[in-house]
Amino acid sequence: GGPWAPWIPSKQNTHAPAANEAEDSGVVAIPHLSRDLLACYDGNGSNFGTHPQNVLRGMIYDTKTWEYPYLYNLIDQYRSLEKYNNGYAYNMMFVGPGWLNKMGRWEQPYELLKKSYEDGMKYYGDLKKEGKLTDMTMAEFADYYRQKKTYTEPECALWRDILYGSDKQLFWYCDPFMRACVNMDQGGAIVDLRPYAAKLEWPVGIGTKHVTDASYPFLIQEKYRAGYFTHYAGEGTVRSAKLKHNGEEVDLCLCRTKAHFSQEGSTRILTLDPVDIEFYDLTVKLQTIVSFEEGSSAIKIERKILEMSDPNAEVELNEYIVACYGTTEYSEDMMGITLSTKKGDEVETLDYEYKCREMEKADADEVRAVIPQIETAVSMSTNAEGAVGYVKEGYAFSPMLTLGYNSKIKDKEVVA
């Protein structure tokens, strides 16, 4: 649940970046390795990093020629992240000498281990000679990082699959208030969300509640909480939208697409390619735009109807977030959570009791969940006219909470 690239840890929780000088712990932290932001998310983190032995352990090499182009492609994709971070990209190989011994400790022969190390270092060395890489000590880098980055400047990565031959794309965003992952294979759904805003005090070690678990809790985590596809009890944790027409329903999680990154002032923008949604008697071309305004602690999601086969048709749009909290695949106690709807001064609340209840409010200004266990509130609002806000509690077999808005949308309209 922490950053994938260097950050300034906050005093209260080292996984959450500091938002200002008062929260600054005084150090610059670096990740142990630079890992594949798709393969390590979907699979084993020890197989896909810029440590040659990781790549060998993942068996991502030619057994006859002992070549491993994936290692170089991984380094190059990290180099490309400068496009999303104001000209800055970071990469490292951090390993001890133990894996170069001849004691049979590793999965591959010593000769291959030695060759992979030398080849990896040579690749960095050649980049340096070409003027494409600057090598620094950790102390030098800490000074560079503080000079280069502001506290609230986010780290961004539009990452694509370079291993399995798919077109899958993820976008990662990290700042002092949240870490989010947008999955283009699921129509731009948010599939991982960590609410750093609380800078949660989370003691770890012997004599604490968390002997070994230092993870920052999630609100959404598709691997541990099933994501879009789960059992018959409904969605796992995900932030997505459904379109409904004449009794048919399509979730954007089923609409694969691609994204393009841009920046306007202090806002990072993800523009997704339009998707076609086919109902029995209607086809809708819809585009999604996801915006992250620096320092706002908010994510803006716009849906644009570009075209309809029947220009006079109207479809229902259900924007929703299914969330919970935790650090593992095992559910936590949801008692104590409060769900609410707000319209002007009218606030209606529902205390979570696993009773599968629902509550809605026409023209709601906001729907909200307060999760005291992780000192976090998550809310949703919309600019859609006549939208109905709703909240739902789950039950023991599906211990989630849902916030959402139902509205109508027509051809050429935009809802955010």
Labelled PLM ranges:
Residues 1-82:
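Active-site-adjacent pocket scaffolds in enzyme catalytic domains
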Residues 1-35, 89-100, 107-109, 130-156:
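Aromatic- and carboxylate-enriched substrate-binding clefts and catalytic-loop regions
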Residues 62-77, 87-94, 272-276, 322, ...:
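Beta-strand-rich recognition/accessory modules
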Residues 64-79, 105-126:
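Well-ordered, non-membrane alpha-helical segments in soluble/globular domains
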Residues 145-182:
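Surface beta-strand/loop "capping" patches
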Residues 177-184, 282-294, 348-350, 368-390:
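Broad, structure-driven detector of short, well-ordered beta-strand segments within folded domains
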Residues 179-278:
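Acidic-aromatic substrate-binding/catalytic surfaces of carbohydrate-active enzymes
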Residues 192-196, 275, 282-286, 294-344:
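Acidic (Asp/Glu-rich), glycine- and aromatic
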